[in-house]
Amino acid sequence: SNGRNAAAGDKPSYWITLAITDCCANPVCNGKHCQGRR
């Protein structure tokens, strides 16, 4: 993964990690970062 996403923009890396985790739990966002997670 590129470590960046549209939702996170250029936020701190910890924020990006949280955003990706939240994205995993979000069915609308799921798949962008969490392919195969669900």
From Swiss-Prot:
Protein name: Alpha-conotoxin LvIC
Keyword Disulfide bond: yes
A single cellular component GO annotation: extracellular region
InterPro entries reported in the protein's UniProt record: Conotoxin_a-typ
Species in which this protein is naturally found: Conus lividus
The family this protein is said to belong to: Belongs to the conotoxin A superfamily.
One Pfam family this sequence matches: Toxin_8
Post-translational note: The two analogs ([DelQ14]LvIC and [D1G,DelQ14]LvIC) are amidated at their N-terminal Cys.
Record's keyword annotation contains GTP-binding: no
Other known facts: Negative results: The native synthetic peptide, and its two analogs show little or not inhibition on mouse alpha-1-beta-1-delta-epsilon (CHRNA1-CHRNB1-CHRND-CHRNE), rat alpha-2-beta-2/CHRNA2-CHRNB2, rat alpha-2-beta-4/CHRNA2-CHRNB4, rat alpha-3-beta-2/CHRNA3-CHRNB2, rat alpha-3-beta-4/CHRNA3-CHRNB4, rat alpha-4-beta-2/CHRNA4-CHRNB2, rat alpha-7/CHRNA7, and rat alpha-6/alpha-3-beta-2-beta-3 (CHRNA6/CHRNA3-CHRNB2-CHRNB3) nAChRs (IC(50)>10 uM).
Functional summary from the UniProt entry: Alpha-conotoxins bind to the nicotinic acetylcholine receptors (nAChR) and inhibit them. This synthetic peptide inhibits rat alpha-6/alpha-3-beta-4 nAChR (IC(50)=3.3 uM).
Localization annotation: Secreted
Tissue spec. comment: Expressed by the venom gland.
Sorted UniProt keywords: Acetylcholine receptor inhibiting toxin, Amidation, Disulfide bond, Neurotoxin, Postsynaptic neurotoxin, Secreted, Toxin
Positions of disulphide bridges: 23-29, 24-34
Domain statement: The cysteine framework is I (CC-C-C). Alpha4/4 pattern.
Residues excised as propeptide: 1-21
Lineage top rank: taxon: Eukaryota
GO MF, any single term: toxin activity
In-chain residues carrying the UniProt-annotated modification Glutamine amide: 35
